[in-house]
Amino acid sequence: MVAELTALRDQIDSVDKALLDLLAKRLELVAEVGEVKSRYGLPIYVPEREASMLASRRKEAEALGVPPDLIEDVLRRVMRESYTSENDKGFKTLCPELRPVVIVGGKGQMGRLFEKMLGLSGYTVKTLDKEDWPQAETLLSDAGMVIISVPIHLTEQVIAQLPPLPEDCILVDLASVKNRPLQAMLAAHNGPVLGLHPMFGPDSGSLAKQVVVWCDGRQPEAYQWFLEQIQVWGARLHRISAVEHDQNMAFIQALRHFATFAYGLHLAEENVNLDQLLALSSPIYRLELAMVGRLFAQDPQLYADIIMSSESNLALIKRYYQRFGEAIALLEQGDKQAFIASFNRVEQWFGDHAKRFLVESRSLLRSANDSRP
């Protein structure tokens, strides 16, 4: 039996090595694709191409008796690596006549990411940090674009302290709140103004499939090329007004981060045994715990700034607290029927999204379980 098992495992090892050879060949081809895309200014990520390719491979897998979900999982991971590989090949310069780009806060993580992407796209990039401020007027005197990438609580102050910029200079900020920084930029500069919010962390590796929100400020025709450049990097652009942006971010960021903070605080105060929780956890709880731990591995100032960026955030969090109290009252009353009625009402509100989220979450949970030690 042992000899038979060993022989089969040896065959599996041979197949795995053949897979490695094929993956290496695919990455070589991807590198060539990256060079072509870079030369012609084509975006890294083309959703139609990806969807068509995955649909074809799923059909072919089914015909071979291979689970379609398996080949899709494998290909999605391979494509993620491919996007990172293409990233390193550089990008076409869509505005070759642009004067130097100056990133204020260029030593921060997001500032460094934009410095890297703009550099890969052939632009001259300079950075301006607090120790360089005495030279700010000189550094900014011939800037073609200035990107503000500083902590939220400093954004408006830094914008107000900018020396006069060239009239055609594009002033951009990357803050995760938009209305007040946008108004500050419009007041500080008479030229083109653009508000951006990258909806991802600086450790993403590639901008492929990442969302970048933009809010028009002034003279959008002057920065249209920059939006197109971001699309070439592979990102998905979403346009919204600054006011609507901040209203949505109250849910996406402020409320979510506060709830995560409160849950982490509760775990710490209860002094639970984390190792034991992890050993006993289901995939969904392990994933949730990872998201909580991830928050506390990052900069507390950033999250304090996001959560406390407006009074409307506090009002929303208070309403959440109130509904928590209403839900606890159901438990205190032992009213299962009222609980079920509330559950069904929320289910109806989610509509078809609930079933779609159920399907989407399955793949996330499988992946979380696969990576379990």
UniProtKB/Swiss-Prot annotation:
Pathway in which the depicted protein is active: Amino-acid biosynthesis; L-tyrosine biosynthesis; (4-hydroxyphenyl)pyruvate from prephenate (NAD(+) route): step 1/1; Metabolic intermediate biosynthesis; prephenate biosynthesis; prephenate from chorismate: step 1/1
Domain Chorismate mutase: from-to ranges: 1-90
InterPro entries the UniProt entry points to: 6-PGluconate_DH-like_C_sf (IPR008927), Chor_mut/prephenate_DH_T (IPR008244), Chorismate_II_sf (IPR036263), CM_dom_sf (IPR036979), CM_II_prokaryot (IPR002701), CM_T (IPR011277), NAD(P)-bd_dom_sf (IPR036291), PDH_C (IPR046825)
Keyword presence, Isomerase: yes
Residues of the Prephenate/arogenate dehydrogenase domain: 99-361
Subcellular location: Cytoplasm
GO BP field: chorismate metabolic process; tyrosine biosynthetic process
Catalytic activity: chorismate = prephenate; prephenate + NAD(+) = 3-(4-hydroxyphenyl)pyruvate + CO2 + NADH
PANTHER family given in the database record: PREPHENATE DEHYDROGENASE, PREPHENATE DEHYDROGENASE [NADP(+)]
Family classification: In the C-terminal section; belongs to the prephenate/arogenate dehydrogenase family.
Protein name: T-protein
Organism (species): Enterobacter agglomerans (Erwinia herbicola)
Gene that this sequence comes from: tyrA
